[in-house]
Amino acid sequence: NVRFDLSSATSSSYKTFIKNLREALPKDGKVYDIPVLLSTVMDSRRFILIDLVNYDGQSITAAIDVLNVYIVAYSTGTVSYFFQQVPAQAPKLLFKGTQQRTLPYTGNYENLQTAAKKLRENIELGLPALDSAITTLFHYNAEAAASALLVLIQTTSEAARFRYIELQIANNVGTKFKPSQTIISLENNWSALSKQIQIAKNKNGQFETPVILIDPQGNRVQITNVTSNVVTQNIQLLLNIGAT
């Protein structure tokens, strides 16, 4: 399991955790020097586990789908909670021996924001926010769980996908911050960027369809080819366009 302990967390240990998370995901080669995730995998390798420990030493284990870096479920050790619409094999393979429950929402942002009654841009990130999220999930407070899961997903999966998000969180070891429109636009466009970067391989580096992002100054930017910084320095994992 990949592990991250908040009680001794530093900017450096968080970056190491994200590096270890990226490395734990099986790859299908690289495109423009960016690792591509698998499009299919045998059940026994479908999920990886990450252990997260809060300031008080309470821990949860989250299960991540290696095909898309989605969190599908988490466990407190005795009880496990699965999102709706997870891969059918997830409950058979994960957290056996726990009391398995299904959360009242799927893991997508729209559903979680509706359940949280808040948009992501109004939910604070940073390692203190992750500590609170782990506490909420450990004790399972139904009302607060959706917000906590939004923090968890962005601090793990999204940081693994994008170096920019990783660095924003690494720079907030002792503080909380609300995600910028830059972060939100990256999260919303990971699939689109992944697809266009893979298409560009056969189009001399050109995207078939531009991807619109928001830069740190708040401007809309059209990404049209693989020379963009988002491709050369930011995105760290690509969703395989062969994955269904």
Curated annotation (Swiss-Prot):
It is an enzyme of class 3 (hydrolase). InterPro entries: Ribosome-inact_prot_sf, Ribosome_inactivat_1/2, Ribosome_inactivat_prot, Ribosome_inactivat_prot_CS, Ribosome_inactivat_prot_sub1, Ribosome_inactivat_prot_sub2. The active site is at Y70, Y109, E158, R161. It catalyses: Endohydrolysis of the N-glycosidic bond at one specific adenosine on the 28S rRNA. Pfam families: RIP. Has cytotoxic activity towards cancer cells, but not normal cells. Inhibits the growth of the human leukemia cell line K562, the murine melanoma cell line B16 and the lung adenocarcinoma cell line A549 with IC(50) values of 88.1 nM, 63.4 nM and 359.3 nM respectively. SUPFAM superfamilies: Ribosome inactivating proteins (RIP). Glycans are attached at N189, N225. This is Ribosome-inactivating protein cucurmosin. One of its GO terms (molecular function) is toxin activity. The N-linked glycan consists of GlcNAc2Man3Xyl. Belongs to the ribosome-inactivating protein family. Type 1 RIP subfamily. PANTHER family: PTHR33453, RIBOSOME-INACTIVATING PROTEIN (PTHR33453:SF34). Coiled coil: none annotated. One of its GO terms (biological process) is defense response. Its EC number is 3.2.2.22. Keywords: Glycoprotein, Hydrolase, Plant defense, Protein synthesis inhibitor, Toxin. Disulfide bonds: none annotated.
